[in-house]
Amino acid sequence: MMLSISDQDLSLRRRQFLKIGGLGLGGLTLSQLLAVREAAGIGQLHSDRSVIFLFLHGGPSQTETFDPKPNAPAGIRSATGDISTSIPGLRFGATFPKLASRSHLFSIVRSFQTGDGNHDIKPIVGRDSGGANLGSIYARVAGTNHPVTGMPRNVALFPRAVAPDSQPENNNFGRFTSTGALGSAYAPFVPGAGGNAQADMQLMISRQRLDDRRNLLGELDRVKQAINVEGLAGNDRLNRQAFETIVGGVANAFDLSNENQKVIESYDTAPLVRPENISRKWRNYNNYVDNAQSLGKLLLLARRLCESGCGFVTVTTNFVWDMHSDVNNAGVEEGMQYMGLPLDHALSALIDDLESRGLRDKVMVVACGEMGRTPKINARGGRDHWGGLAPLLIYGGGLKMGQVIGESNADASRPAADPMNNQNLIATVMHQLMDVGQLRTVTGLPQDVMRAVTAAEPIPGLL
């Protein structure tokens, strides 16, 4: 149900409040919001940077992406071939021509290990994050909403955020909204059909009144005092985030129709892989379609949210990188046509957009999955699970770009130098989002937060 507020009368019925996407009223008053922010934010320990974490669920191949091993024997080297990049001597898999021409703008880690070949959602949620989404750790330090715009600090984007007819998010291998021991107040805000629907953030009220945040909150406070709110505390996170999003005047950030059409077209990955060109013999067909239809627009939406004050955006499509060549999934050569081309286009569009907007130092982009793939292609033309090495791309955030960090061995099965793991990646992300040195002096923070932030050193050469 959409909340309706007229310009003439801001009084709202209790029943209307209770049905706003299943929300109640907890956490509405300015004093309560400030108290929450003070308790959660603990001063200004966080930076003004944002992170877009693109999780490539299923486990992309290190060989067909950024470590093609062109001199290795057939069956080990990239099945899609390889191409030169803007960095002399550096080669990528052949389905990444756009990223190849921009390789000087980001860094690749060729010695990254996720630790095992299991399907889960590490490193975004896993043992090394204390069972919490990395964005939830950030929100525990920075607060759940931006104090000026009201934008949720921690957002998770699934295909339905931009493509309502797509499949629901896949939680079979872990929940991207997990918060570990931090509590549900710090869970990612989920727009679209999988969470608080975009329609639930639209108010029938003039822009002038919507932007008058103090007046609107005052009216809402008076309504709250007139009704019984004792039973609404369990929905405090949803209430606070949804209403702060509404009254902060940032609901438009979630609506791509407010974006310049040429910018939308520059991100759009749908024309690259048409549904009729994807084989229906794979059980993953619908997810392949959803990925192509949504990936570019998801990254565009992530950029819009970062500009409006979001600090951490998880972006993922549904489990499309598992290229065994079995009844569920295509092999690597066919699968990279479905997956590599949209990823190449979408990441390149995001990098170009951030560069043109002067956001290179303000927004960090991370792209990786839960594992890599076997160094040897199987008899069916697929690659199987492999935890010994995985691809990792990092852009922006004030880090040193245009680098290849670490080195893999001859068949891309293990690091040959400078091994990096999930803890190093998490430390790198957290050092960009918060003042880790100052954080060490703060008492009262959950051990899971401190452990995730301080368990390892950031990836050397980036800071």
Model features per residue range: what roles?
Residues M1-L463:
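Ligand-binding pockets and gating/stacking loops
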